[in-house]
From Swiss-Prot:
Catalysis: reaction(s): oxaloacetate + GTP = phosphoenolpyruvate + GDP + CO2
Residues modified as N6-acetyllysine: K88
Protein name per Swiss-Prot or TrEMBL: Phosphoenolpyruvate carboxykinase [GTP], mitochondrial
A single GO cellular-component term on record: mitochondrion
Length: 640
């Protein structure tokens, strides 16, 4: 009898125990409601059959990705009371989740490897790890055995073949997700290229196996109408990079259930990238064209809810400049045969944070979400529209608001009307400024990489790294105010290296080594690295920089630096614009002395904090080159 660990896999060389020892049901005994099992590639067919044996769904639906199928899925969700039509817009819908299922759950998200050190660095004595959670194969096996047998009883298992990146691109990868959530089906159809063409492209090739269940088997008459299915007490999101697998249980929320997103496109892909010599990063990609017609592409890494989407869809305040969007969240990058770093956006949609999005902050996002959008946990207006904090739209007379909790709400109420991590899920093609090359199979050429975060004090508006190695250190030292996208509470300054802290698929020390190794790639033309901070405040707590469309002024300076312009001056932390080098024409008074000040006492403390963090969290796995950069920074700050 063949043993298996996860569905479709044999017992591995590491001795991992199987999920079940029972033989799989034959294809003939599976109740297939839509699609043809016999037409699936053998590997996919085996994965589906074994998973069905484990989870025991009522039936199987193989998704073809068609418009007719999508219409039927949305109708089913509406019938179940899980989504409501928003008649103010064309084909827009609102979902409200269980209040316990509203964000990524980092504490229940694990990487499974035989050796703990493959996943996380060895910590300095007694420290609590912040760079990922490891679970042993045996413990993971027990967790799976506890959760998955029979977990889909009474539900449909949907088979979702999907491509991360344009179908057929050499930079793309294929996954197959099995889920018992129709909400996931509707969302994945937006966020990925999904359906029959993906299976045709896959053939007998390799794919990432993704298994998801809301963790609520139906043994009676189904869910009560409108009850969001989830199992928060048993939630677990597991990644098995050696086997290229993802397993998720108990949550229907996007980051936990749309397995192509953070789970595949960052955690698993970062491990693929290390093994294959490329980069999978939490970065937006944008094209920027100056008034003379010169176009450049940049990638930028900010922690969640720090303005990636706003920057990726920016409407430049500088006359004659144009920004076009390739992607707002994830970049897969590889050097081509000419040594040029090229990037694709592996996603097909935007899964954006709604609160704070308005015609003033992101007019292109507002234009994008007027149709074919699935909103989650935003407020609803009585005239069939949506509402959230910062939407900046006056309500017509007599129009009332229902909060994300389904309760009456009015401006001035203590609780927010929309959850801080409420989302819009919308096809990328609807964005009015999508770059013409956003689906180019070869990717777009990246000339600069930008790191950034929310730093209310001490960190200047923009600075350039001295070189690649220094830039890698700058990425490793990133810190930012915490965001709503995870379950952390309150505003604390958190270390978030490369904006990847929750998304590393392997040991962060080895991730740093991988970034450093790019310097040794034959013929590689390394992008310049910059750091930005739109969020510095004055003593009264007011922002020193207007941000949003005015951020084009910083991109202008970056582009001029890429052209070789001598417009930077050296400081202990990097190269900042010379006085007058930043185009501030037409702006009301900006206090550049505060905006670019580098207080010695702040940076002495910053160095101590960075050293403490890297020593504690990365410890013996910290590359000597990164430690040398830290010591060099410390020496420069001491001489200020």
């Amino acid at each position: 009898m063949a043993a298996m660990y996860l569905p479709g896999l044999r017992l591995s060389r590491h001795g991992l125990r199987p999920w079940c020892w029972s033989p799989c049901r034959s294809i003939q005994t599976l109740h297939v409601l839509s699609g043809d099992m016999s037409q699936l590639p053998a590997g996919v067919r085996d994965f589906v059959a074994r998973s069905a044996h484990l989870c025991q769904p009522e039936g199987i639906h193989i998704c073809d990705g068609t418009e007719a199928e999508n219409t039927a899925i949305l109708a089913l969700l509406e019938e179940q009371g899980l989504i409501r039509k928003l008649p103010k817009y064309k084909n827009c819908w609102l979902a409200r989740t269980d209040p316990k299922d509203v964000a990524r759950v980092e504490s229940k998200t694990v990487i499974v490897t035989p050796s703990q050190r493959d996943t996380v660095p060895l910590l300095a004595g007694g420290a609590r790890g912040q760079l990922g959670n490891w679970m042993s194969p045996d413990e993971f096996q027990r967790a799976v055995d506890e959760r998955f047998p029979g977990c889909m009883q009474g539900r449909i298992m949907y088979v979702l073949p999907f491509s991360m990146g344009p179908v057929g691109s050499p930079l793309s990868r294929i996954g197959v997700q099995l889920t018992d959530s129709a909400y996931v089906v509707a969302s994945m159809r937006i966020m990925t290229r999904l359906g029959t063409p993906v299976l045709q492209a896959l053939g007998d090739g390799d794919f990432i196996k993704c298994l998801h269940s809301v963790g609520q088997p139906l043994t009676g008459h189904g869910d009560p109408v409108g009850q969001w299915p989830c199992n928060p007490e048993k939630t677990l999101i597991g990644h098995v990079p050696d086997q290229r697998e993802i397993v998720s249980f108990g949550s229907g929320y996007g980051g936990n259930s749309l397995l192509g997103k953070k789970c595949f496109a960052l955690r698993i892909a970062s491990r693929l990238a290390r093994d294959e010599g490329w980069l999978a990063e939490h970065m937006l990609i944008l094209g920027i064209t100056n008034p003379a017609g010169k176009k450049r592409y940049v990638a930028a890494a900010f922690p969640s809810a720090c303005g990636k989407t706003n920057l990726a869809m920016m409407r430049p305040a500088l006359p004659g400049w144009k920004v076009e969007c390739v992607g707002d969240d994830i970049a897969w990058m590889r050097f081509d045969s000419e040594g040029q770093l090229r990037a694709i956006n592996p996603e097909n949609g935007f899964f954006g944070v709604a609160p704070g999005t308005s015609a003033a902050t992101n007019p292109n996002a507002m234009a994008t979400i007027q149709s074919n959008t699935l909103f989650t946990n935003v407020a609803e207006t009585s005239d069939g529209g949506v509402y959230w904090e910062g939407i900046d739209q006056p309500l017509p007379p007599g129009v009332t608001i229902t909060s994300w909790l389904g309760k009456p709400w009015k401006p001035g109420d203590k609780e927010p009307c929309a959850h801080p991590n409420s989302r819009f899920c919308v096809p990328a093609r609807q964005c009015p400024i999508m770059d013409p090359a956003w689906e180019a199979p070869e990717g777009v050429p990246i000339d600069a990489i930008i790191f950034g975060g929310r730093r209310p004090k001490g960190v200047p508006l923009v600075y350039e790294a001295f070189n690649w190695r220094h830039g890698v250190f700058v990425g490793s030292a990133m810190r930012s105010e915490s965001t709503a996208a995870a379950e952390h509470k309150g505003k604390t300054i958190m270390h978030d290296p490369f904006a990847m802290r929750p998304f590393f698929g392997y040991n962060f020390g080895r991730y740093l080594e991988h970034w450093l190794s790019m310097e040794g790639q034959k013929g590689a033309r390394l992008p310049r690295i910059f750091h930005v901070n739109w969020f510095r405040r004055d003593e009264a707590g007011r922002f020193l920089w207007p941000g949003f469309g005015e951020n084009a002024r910083v991109l202008d300076w970056i582009c001029r630096r890429l052209e070789g312009e001598d417009s930077a001056q050296e400081t202990p932390i990097g190269l900042v614009p010379k006085e007058g080098a930043l185009d501030l024409s037409g702006l009301s008074a900006v206090d550049t002395s505060q905006l670019f000040s580098i207080p010695k006492d702040f940076w002495e403390q910053e160095v101590r904090d960075i050293r403490g963090y890297l020593t504690e969290q990365v410890n013996q796995d910290l590359p000597k080159e990164v430690l040398a950069e830290l010591e060099a920074l410390e020496g420069r700050v001491q001489k200020m």
